Structures are given as structure tokens and as C-alpha cells.
Amino acid sequence: MTDIRELRKVVDRFRAQERKAAASINLVPSENKLSPLAQMPLSTDYYNRYFFNDELDPGFWQFRGGQEVAKIQTELARGHLSRLARAPYVNERPISGLSAMMMAMAGLGGPPGGTVVSIDAASGGHYATADMARRLGFESATVPVVRGRVDEQWFGQVLREHVPELVYLDLQNSRHELEVSRVAELIEAHSPHTILHVDCSHTMGLILGGALSNPLDAGAHTMGGSTHKSFPGPHKGVLFTRSPELHQRLKHAQFTMLSSHHFAETLALGLAAAEFRHFGHAYAEQVVANARLLGKLLAADGFDVTADENGHATSTHQLWVRIGDAEQTDRFSKYLYDHGIRVNVQVDLPGLPGPVLRLGVNELTFLGGHEAAVHALAEEFSHARDGVRRDGEGSQRVREQYGPPFYFVEFS
């Protein structure tokens, strides 16, 4: 029999950790935070409801729980996402980035037995892509990427040998913008029937905000990914295209691969997209500026910031910093954590053996972090390295430098 006293302890822990989280600084590039407005649907009855009537057919209300707010999905979410991506066709039903990946492969990869080309994981591609292709019945081929550029000779050979149905560009670990236009040109030259899809999960917010190029403008047929990394949305996924035929292929795959699309999260995505149309451009530009400034400050202070020969550290929200061996990195990470600053340690970043801090300034920026906050954050990194100011107040000192957030505060 359940002991209610134990449940009370669990609830107390949740509440305590929620207070702690609210005071923390998160520097994880694959995470972000919902605005108060976008968070609202997750605590409503719509979290419990199905919604299938995408066309708002008055004779198709088989599930009526979402009827009163249906247009938040069909018009607000789809409409704002469409305008942000400049893509008339949007599928907002994927429940995650991997969910969107499955739908894209199943819908665009052709009959089983064909080849799906993706980015080598050692070059920054997603760890699951090649295996996902094989599990869906496709052959998998990978290509290396260096500083955002696909190896053209290698890629051309893959196109000629495999004549793939789908090229799935899935760069997740990168300090550089993915160059899509040259890939599209090579496909047109060597395998013109091949579909080019760009998984921009990590850079979605930077693309929709205009800080990075839109892959659809560069020749991609489709794009998509998760909506909770540089884009400040819920844990969901989305797919975009300008082709009605490809939209139908994606929709057909989605229909048989996904039932519940998590209605409340989709409403949250709609509200996040509406806010992003107001704040997104300024936010995206500030994210890149903050990442570059943090890299410059840390490098000037003696930190081993990964950069190109010309000193260029990043074009995205990601910044990579080496602290030392595993023990040194863990000690540094724990010091920051004890001071309310959470960092992400990775051991398989392209060209960087051993543990590395993979930092993201997307959430800090969304919550109001501008130049002053980045300067304060760099000071806390110095404190962690030098072992000074062990007062647990690091995140508070950074937050004191926040400016206005990139969302509507009236809904807080």
C-alpha cells in the first residue's frame, strides 16, 4: 500500500528543486525554457485531450475535448510557424526531434532498401541517424563535415555510387553554420531526384529568427527538428516544406507513425511561435553575439576555447571549452553547479578527444542575458577555475545583470 508520507516527501523535493531551478543559470545548448505564456497550456485540461480534427470539419468532432481552442493549433501554431520559416506547409505533430526524424525518413526515403545519406557522427551528426535509417529498412551512408562544409569529393562519390533517395543533413554538434547551398548544387548535378532534408534541431531558433540562413532558401526540399533548443518552445518537433507533394508524403508517414501528438504541448508551441514572431529576430542575433562575446572573454582570461586559426569561435549558440582531464572537468562542473550554474560535458565532440564543456547561451539569452550578464558569467568561470568566492551565489550575480527577457512579461 502506498505510504502518503513518502509521497509528501517527494512533493517537497519537487518544490525545493523547482525553487533551485528558477534561480539557476542553464548553459546547455540542447535545452531552453518556455515563457510563462507558452507554459500555460501544460497545466490545463488540454494536457489530457486528443485532437485530430486538423481541418476543423464540423462533422468530424470525434474527440471534442480540444474543440474550444482548436484554432490555437490550426491557425496560431501552424500560421506563425509557417511565416517564420517562409514555408506554406507545416507539420506540427511530431512529438520530438527523433519523432520528426522518423517521419522524414519514412516519408521521404522511398521504398525500403534505398539509401539514406547523413552526416558522420564523428563530424557532429546525430548519434542515432544512421541506425534509425537501418531500423527503417534503408541502407545508410555517411559523409564527413568540417567547419559546416560537407566534404564535396566524398559526397559526390556517395551520390554517384548509391543514388540515394534522401540526403538527411543532421549537424548537431557544430560551432559553424551548415552550408546547405553547395550540397543542393551537388545533388542537382549528380542525383537530381534525391530529396534534401535539413535537420536543424539545434539551430532552429537561429534560423527562424534570421541569424542563420534558411535551408529552404538554400535549396533544401524540407527541414525540421526539435523545438526546444535554440528555439524556446516545448519538447516537440516540426517539419517544413514548400512542396505540396512532399507535405503529403510527410503527412502520410505521420498518420501511421504517430497517434497522440501531445495536444497541450502543441498549443504551447503555437504560443511560443506567436511570441517568437515578435522577439525572435532580436533574440537570435543576441544569442550569437553572446556566444561570441563569452568565447572572447574566456579566451582572454586563459581558458582553452576551441576556435579556428583566425580566432573564430562560433557562428551558432554553441561554444566549446576544454578544462582538462575528466577529473578536472568534473570538479569545474561541480563548482559551477554548486553556484547555480549548470554546464554540459561532452566526450565526443568533433576533433576534441576527452571531456569538453559544450556551452549554450540560448536559455540565458532568452531570459534576458545581454552583454553585462555575459561579463558576469565569465567572471564566475574565473572563480570556478581559481577556487574563489565559494558562496553559492554565482547564478545570482549573473541574474542581477539580466535585462528584459525575449517574451511578454505581462503573462508572468
Swiss-Prot record:
The reaction(s) catalysed by this protein are: uridine-5'-aldehyde + L-threonine = (5'S,6'S)-C-glycyluridine + acetaldehyde
SUPFAM superfamilies for the chain: PLP-dependent transferases
Transferase: present as a keyword of the record? yes
Which enzyme type, at the first EC level?
transferase
List, alphabetically, the GO terms of the cellular component aspect: cytoplasm
Q: EC number(s) of the enzyme?
A: 2.2.1.-
Q: Which GO terms describe its biological process?
A: antibiotic biosynthetic process; glycine biosynthetic process from serine; tetrahydrofolate metabolic process
Q: Entry's InterPro entries?
A: PyrdxlP-dep_Trfase, PyrdxlP-dep_Trfase_major, PyrdxlP-dep_Trfase_small, Ser_HO-MeTrfase-like, SHMT-like_dom
Which cofactors does the annotated protein need, by name?
pyridoxal 5'-phosphate
Question: What is any Pfam family matched here?
Answer: SHMT
N6-(pyridoxal phosphate)lysine: modified positions: K229
Question: Which pathway is recorded for this entry?
Answer: Antibiotic biosynthesis
What's the stated role of this polypeptide?
Answer: Transaldolase involved in the biosynthesis of the capuramycin-type nucleoside antibiotic A-503083. Catalyzes the condensation of L-threonine and uridine-5'-aldehyde to form 5'-C-glycyluridine (GlyU). Forms (5'S,6'S)-GlyU.
Family membership noted in the UniProt record: Belongs to the SHMT family.
What protein name does the entry list?
Answer: L-threonine:uridine-5'-aldehyde transaldolase
Higher taxonomy: Bacteria, Bacillati, Actinomycetota, Actinomycetes, Kitasatosporales
